[in-house]
Amino acid sequence: MRMNTARLVLIMGLLATSPAFAVDHQVKMVDEGAEGNMIFEPGFLNAKAGDTVTFVVKDPGHNVISRHVPPGADSWKGTVSQGFTVTLTKEGVYLYECDLHKMLGMVAVIQVGKPVNLEAAKAAAAALSKKMAMGAERLDEYMGKIR
């Protein structure tokens, strides 16, 4: 009886770490939020490979476009005023933006597992910050959360 219980516990543990238990994270695209105007909420997301991110339109007139992804990861581009879901398949740092409001600082960061492309992501963030009229400090703050 104890052997069957031990096997059951082992099997349950293995199943709990499988991709079948991936999380769907929700990121809102908003005109005005807790961290300012023209933002993604949350602006920094920590996820695992296999998780999905669903970008939810709370205020129309926004889209989501990846600007930097880890090696081997697919880039993405959503349609203006429409929700969008992406599956995060590779570990690393992902930078994304609203194409219409990036100049206003509508950018955000996702870390998936280990930040294997951290130096390249930092360089991409620095280049992106130079093109922003406002909100660059937001991107710096999000990049500072990477561990």
Name every feature range the model reports, one short phrase each.
Residues 21-147:
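Extracytoplasmic copper-binding redox domains, predominantly the cupredoxin/blue-copper superfamily
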Residues 17-18:
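N-terminal signal peptide c-region/cleavage motif recognized by signal peptidases
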Residues 1-9:
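Bacterial N-terminal signal peptides that target proteins for export
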